[in-house]
């Protein structure tokens, strides 16, 4: 009879990976997993689109494993799970990569390279690493349809985006505004608030800060009695001081006037600042010093508070312009301008605090949203420049430097600019990070930039010399950085299009409460708080490669149209041609057919720049309309994927409207997407469809190195996923990542952990299968017989099947509740603790030799069922080895007629097979065994050495009954002759209690000493009560003090000849005295083990009979003679002889002697 169950000579999960992939590919298993579920309920999954212009990393394995787990699980549960891959192809990552490759900057586009050629380069670059992404996806076993992905640059995808924008436009949720926005000079575009709130965007930076002195024009009398009067205002961005036009105070805040000296110049001054911050800027030790005694250079600068005010008392006071390079101007609607006289005064602001600074805020309306708002409310002008085009611009240009004089309007320069003062600073970069001199070979030299003198330092030195700086110091503060360039952002006035997301904020919050967030805290915390503080969505991007904003406007802005489809644009172009604004319709010229939604038809056109920029439309009153030049936020692209991936509403309208493919039942991405993709999905769904976009979401944590550091090429701590999979296979990697910590926790990735998983879990499971296959093939077991009825199976079989069904129930619940870590750990514990280390170990003899009895059949059927079920339970997490194991089992038995485990049904638990009382009894056996084996290890007594007795104090009859039922099993496992039960209070074992001061200290405080003394004096009866009830009331001189079992450590004292262990309510004592009789039996057992090892290393078949010869030795001869028959029976020996000399024998070394054994086949 041939072998039916495959047996392996080695365990190679990397090869398993390759073999199973080949099988999947040849049998189109992924496609079948969907087609065979036609007509079944749908489980809707959305794939967040990665960008293929960057290599995939180990963190992508984590995110994709999580997605794959639940898609596979739901498929096995009978759902049809379609999963379409996608590519995020627009935006800054692509553009910056292309700029670097071409050696250009944004300013070169349209000059050194045409927009068409530049965008063609972007289109090519964005798919650069597609093959690597496809390879990793394939190798790691992530099933997603990469043959038909959605691609965000596709014209049909863009058309859906236009349709969505039109819906927002119709609802009045799309508007244009000139407001202060986060702006990235390095990227050359504005940023949305959700981009600015990506993890890592806000960083602690060490900058030069200044408390500037603003000289008063009309001081109150008491302010002018000592030196020159100043307002003090603190800033972390001294480069904005030349743009200052106001100071802001809190009307209800208390302020003080302080007579003192400038520490740098020694000049007498009177300064005004918040009373609460007085001690921040003045040394209290100097409060009693006389002003007249001060000498320039003294470390202690005297000060004297001479008056107090409310902020409201200061409003309206005027001061001199701090850095009078440029005069502020007022600009009328027709573009004419005049010098303004309304600036440089104190204004109110409710947002002013006394947490830091001086309680007076320096206002530069062109560089701060709050600044702009309070200035506008108070009629304060912004400090603008007028360029040669007549446009009003901040003092800093879009590249991050002060405007050059020759870029400005000549009349403006003549009337408003102090050329002598300003020319020294024209062209100065406000932050060294923007200066191209610090870009070396396309990389930012951050160290060099930080080492060089900054504009902040230069301005502070200038102010210091002019008696305008009260204090200059380095300060660490949190500052936003661009999510793609890693360089600081500015807050800058921009003409931008916005989505009025704040209008739907309440509804977004309401719908968010219906989403199942894993973890829940992300939904209520990070995401929920984000929604509570929502800002309008800055949609505009001043770039080239992206989805064009589909809005055309007249020059005066009186008419506009938002285009929702290519067909509408086609028809509007026809009107424009008729009006004479366009010579012909480019879409008609290229043969585009409106309403025909084929790929070939849409490939005839291109909806990107520069082609849409060339289209001029006509307004209803006959004026030309040009497209607003902006692109839209790339995050809108990805947030629209539920609709755009199916070209909604132009195609597939019914299946989305009927909610067949929407909303998603489940999505998953990294925690960095909480305010990215998760938000944009939710925002668009709420604003357009009044719906959630997803019902459940897992936001997985970061994958860090083993020391908790972020992985990066620079730190040389990044892990290559390809080499890792090649070495270990995907399964150990996936299992390690999922079971090491919950997906939403950060993972400290340690490559050694993969090897541990491979050995401990997969190795154990492989060995268990190998054991089964070996003996099943010997006995010809093929599972053709009817199942042995449960009632007729031995208790140990009924126990493991009960535990197995409990496992099915618990694992199914875990998967269903998106708790993969719990599921994996449950499976691992079952395989290691229950199946391998307990069931198989206890039942080996049932599989060895002998007749094919019902008992042996029950053992085979039970172990087979366990292996097949474990394979199915683990399949979502470790799809490769699960499939291999399942195939090896079912090919031999023919029990499941499916080509892959991933087409099989997920196991269903059978309640009638679960016996909790039996599980409790066996758990007791396992617990006692574990404790006794630990005691053996403590004194280095091997399990093969029999011992006389275990003594167990029992708390009650139920505990005693549980142990009695498994008494023989325990005795056999720990190799003792007897188990004795004693009354827990019989005094045989003495228990003690030790306080945990960290827990009890906070509870009892000053009473702790008395509590500790009372605990030390607790009687055995009191300790028993504490163990039984979990708490005990101590008597402290008539007062009651209740301690809990968790607050103390209960332990047992060893007694002579015995070792004692205690865990919870269970205590065991092991007699460790080895008598001569026990020693002989131990030697016999040890010889059995050594001879079995010789059989194995000699390559004998398990059925081969042997002859044994052992060299004589006074230490072992008695044992060999006494246990001759026992030894032979155990090792299939036909004879066992003692000899004075054994030639060609194997040397066996014992603790203090050695002997030789010869084993030959009979």
From Swiss-Prot:
BP terms from Gene Ontology: isoleucyl-tRNA aminoacylation
Motif ('KMSKS' region): 710-714
Keyword Repeat in record: no
Membrane spanning stretches: none
EC number: 6.1.1.5
Motif ('HIGH' region): 50-60
Chemical reaction(s) catalysed: tRNA(Ile) + L-isoleucine + ATP = L-isoleucyl-tRNA(Ile) + AMP + diphosphate
Keyword annotations: Aminoacyl-tRNA synthetase, ATP-binding, Cytoplasm, Ligase, Metal-binding, Nucleotide-binding, Protein biosynthesis, Zinc
Binding site for ATP: 713
Protein name (record): Isoleucine--tRNA ligase
Transport keyword on record: no
Source taxon at top rank: Bacteria
An example molecular function term from Gene Ontology annotations: ATP binding
Enzymatic class: ligase
Description of its domains: IleRS has two distinct active sites: one for aminoacylation and one for editing. The misactivated valine is translocated from the active site to the editing site, which sterically excludes the correctly activated isoleucine. The single editing site contains two valyl binding pockets, one specific for each substrate (Val-AMP or Val-tRNA(Ile)).
Subunit structure of this chain's protein: Monomer.
Function description: Catalyzes the attachment of isoleucine to tRNA(Ile). As IleRS can inadvertently accommodate and process structurally similar amino acids such as valine, to avoid such errors it has two additional distinct tRNA(Ile)-dependent editing activities. One activity is designated as 'pretransfer' editing and involves the hydrolysis of activated Val-AMP. The other activity is designated 'posttransfer' editing and involves deacylation of mischarged Val-tRNA(Ile).
Taxonomic source organism: Bacteroides thetaiotaomicron (strain ATCC 29148 / DSM 2079 / JCM 5827 / CCUG 10774 / NCTC 10582 / VPI-5482 / E50)
Pfam families registered for this protein in UniProt: Anticodon_1 (PF08264), DUF5915 (PF19302), tRNA-synt_1 (PF00133)
Compartments in which it is found: Cytoplasm
PANTHER family xrefs: ISOLEUCINE--TRNA LIGASE, CYTOPLASMIC (PTHR42780:SF1), SOLEUCYL-TRNA SYNTHETASE (PTHR42780)
GO cellular component: cytoplasm
């Amino acid at each position: 009879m041939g072998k039916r169950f495959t047996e392996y000579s080695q365990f190679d999960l990397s090869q398993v990976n390759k073999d199973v992939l080949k099988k999947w590919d040849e049998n189109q298993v992924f496609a079948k997993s969907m087609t065979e579920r036609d007509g079944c309920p749908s489980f809707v999954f959305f794939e967040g689109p990665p960008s293929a212009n960057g290599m995939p990393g180990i963190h992508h394995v984590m995110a994709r494993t999580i997605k794959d787990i639940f898609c596979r699980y739901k498929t096995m549960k009978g759902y049809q799970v379609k999963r379409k891959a996608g590519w995020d192809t627009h935006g800054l990552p692509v553009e910056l990569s292309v700029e670097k490759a071409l050696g250009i900057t944004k300013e070169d586009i349209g000059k050194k390279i045409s927009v068409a050629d530049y965008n063609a380069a972007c289109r090519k670059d964005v798919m650069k690493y597609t093959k690597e992404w496809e390879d990793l996806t394939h190798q790691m076993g992530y099933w997603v349809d990469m043959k038909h992905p959605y691609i965000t640059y596709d014209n049909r995808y863009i058309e859906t985006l236009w349709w969505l924008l039109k819906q927002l436009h119709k609802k009045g949720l799309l508007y244009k505004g000139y407001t202060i926005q986060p702006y990235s000079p390095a990227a050359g575009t504005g940023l949305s608030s959700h981009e600015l709130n990506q993890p890592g965007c806000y960083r602690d930076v060490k900058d030069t800060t200044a408390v500037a002195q603003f000289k008063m024009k009309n001081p109150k009398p008491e302010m002018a009695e000592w030196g020159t009067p100043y307002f003090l205002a603190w800033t972390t961005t001294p480069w904005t001081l030349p743009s200052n036009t106001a100071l802001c105070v809190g009307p209800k805040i208390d302020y003080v006037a302080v007579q003192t000296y400038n520490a740098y110049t020694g000049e007498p001054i009177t300064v005004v600042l918040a009373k609460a911050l007085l001690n921040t800027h003045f040394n209290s030790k100097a409060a009693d010093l006389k002003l007249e005694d001060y000498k320039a250079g003294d470390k202690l600068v005297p000060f004297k508070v001479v008056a107090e005010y409310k902020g409201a008392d200061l409003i309206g006071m005027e001061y001199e312009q701090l850095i009078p390079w440029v005069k502020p101007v007022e600009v009328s609607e027709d573009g004419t301008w005049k010098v303004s006289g309304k600036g440089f005064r104190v204004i109110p602001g409710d947002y002013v605090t006394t947490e830091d600074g001086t309680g007076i805020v320096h206002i530069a309306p062109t560089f701060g949203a709050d600044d702009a708002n309070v200035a506008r409310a108070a009629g304060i002008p912004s400090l603008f420049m007028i360029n040669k085009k007549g446009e009003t611009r901040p003092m800093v240009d879009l590249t991050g430097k002060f405007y050059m004089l020759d870029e400005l309007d000549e009349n403006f320069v003549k009337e408003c600019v102090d050329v002598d003062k300003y020319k020294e600073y024209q062209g100065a970069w406000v932050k060294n990070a923007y200066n191209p001199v610090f870009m070396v070979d396309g990389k930012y030299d951050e160290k060099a930039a930080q080492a060089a003198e900054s504009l902040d330092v230069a301005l502070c030195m200038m102010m210091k010399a002019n008696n305008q700086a009260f204090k200059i110091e380095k300060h660490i503060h949190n500052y936003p950085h661009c999510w793609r360039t890693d360089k600081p952002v500015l807050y800058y006035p921009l003409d931008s299009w916005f989505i009025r997301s704040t209008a739907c904020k309440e509804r977004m919050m309401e719908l968010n409460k219906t989403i199942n967030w894993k973890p829940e805290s992300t939904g209520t915390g990070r995401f929920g708080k984000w929604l509570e503080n929502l800002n309008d969505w800055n949609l505009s991007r001043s770039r080239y490669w992206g989805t064009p904003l589909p809005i055309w406007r007249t020059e005066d802005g009186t008419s506009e149209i938002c285009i929702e489809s290519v067909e509408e644009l086609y028809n509007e172009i026809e009107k424009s041609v008729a009006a004479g604004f366009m010579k012909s319709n480019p879409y008609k010229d290229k043969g585009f057919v409106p309403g025909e939604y084929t790929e070939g038809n849409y490939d005839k056109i291109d909806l990107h720049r520069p082609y849409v920029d060339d289209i001029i439309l006509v307004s209803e009153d006959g004026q030309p309309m040009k497209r607003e030049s902006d692109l839209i936020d790339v995050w809108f692209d990805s947030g629209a994927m539920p609709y755009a991936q199916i070209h909604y509403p132009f195609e597939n309208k019914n299946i989305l409207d009927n909610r067949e493919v929407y909303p998603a039942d489940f999505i998953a991405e990294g925690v960095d997407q909480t305010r990215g993709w998760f938000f944009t999905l939710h925002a668009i769904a709420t604003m357009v469809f009044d719906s959630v976009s997803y019902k459940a979401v897992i936001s997985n944590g970061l994958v860090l190195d083993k020391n908790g550091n972020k992985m990066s090429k620079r730190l040389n701590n990044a892990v290559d996923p390809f080499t890792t999979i090649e070495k270990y296979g995907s399964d150990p990697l996936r299992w390690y990542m999922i079971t090491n910590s919950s997906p939403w926790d950060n993972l400290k990735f340690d490559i050694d952990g993969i090897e541990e998983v491979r050995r401990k879990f997969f190795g154990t499971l492989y060995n268990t299968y190998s054991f089964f296959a070996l003996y099943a093939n010997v006995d010809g077991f093929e599972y053709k017989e009817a199942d042995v009825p449960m009632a007729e199976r031995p208790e140990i079989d009924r126990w493991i099947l009960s535990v197995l069904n409990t496992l099915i129930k618990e694992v199914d619940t875990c998967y269903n509740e998106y708790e993969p870590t719990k599921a994996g750990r449950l499976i691992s514990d079952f395989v290691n603790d229950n199946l391998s280390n307990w069931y198989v170990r206890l039942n080996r003899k049932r599989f060895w030799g002998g007749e094919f009895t019902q008992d042996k059949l029950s053992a085979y059927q039970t172990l087979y069922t366990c292996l097949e079920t474990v394979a199915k339970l683990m399949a979502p997490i470790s799809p490769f080895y699960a499939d291999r194991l399942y195939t090896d089992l079912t090919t031999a038995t023919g029990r499941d007629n499916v080509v892959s485990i991933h087409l099989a049904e997920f196991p269903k638990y059978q309640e009638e097979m679960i016996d909790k009382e039996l599980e409790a009894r066996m758990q007791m056996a396992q617990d006692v065994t574990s404790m006794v084996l630990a005691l053996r290890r403590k004194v280095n007594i091997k399990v093969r050495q029999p011992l006389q007795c275990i003594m167990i104090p029992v708390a009650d009859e139920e505990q005693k009954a549980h142990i009695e039922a498994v008494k023989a099993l325990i005795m056999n496992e720990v190799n003792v002759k007897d188990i004795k039960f004693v009354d827990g209070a019989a005094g045989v074992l003495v228990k003690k209690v030790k306080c945990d001061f960290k827990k009890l200290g906070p509870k009892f405080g000053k009473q702790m000493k008395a509590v500790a003394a009372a605990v030390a004096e607790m009687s055995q009866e009191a300790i028993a009560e504490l163990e039984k009830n979990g708490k005990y009331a101590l008597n402290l001189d008539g007062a009651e003090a209740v301690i809990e079992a968790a607050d103390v450590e209960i332990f047992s004292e060893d007694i002579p000849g015995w070792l004692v262990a205690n865990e919870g309510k269970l205590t065991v004592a092991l007699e460790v005295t080895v008598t001569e009789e026990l020693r002989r039996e131990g030697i016999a057992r040890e010889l059995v083990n050594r001879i079995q090892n010789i059989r194995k290393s000699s390559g004998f078949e398990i059925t081969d009979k042997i002859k044994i010869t052992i060299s004589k030795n006074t230490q072992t001869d008695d044992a060999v003679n006494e246990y001759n028959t026992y030894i032979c029976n155990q090792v299939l020996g036909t004879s066992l002889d003692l000899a004075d000399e054994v030639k060609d024998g194997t040397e066996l070394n014992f603790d203090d002697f050695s002997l030789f054994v010869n084993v030959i086949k009979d």
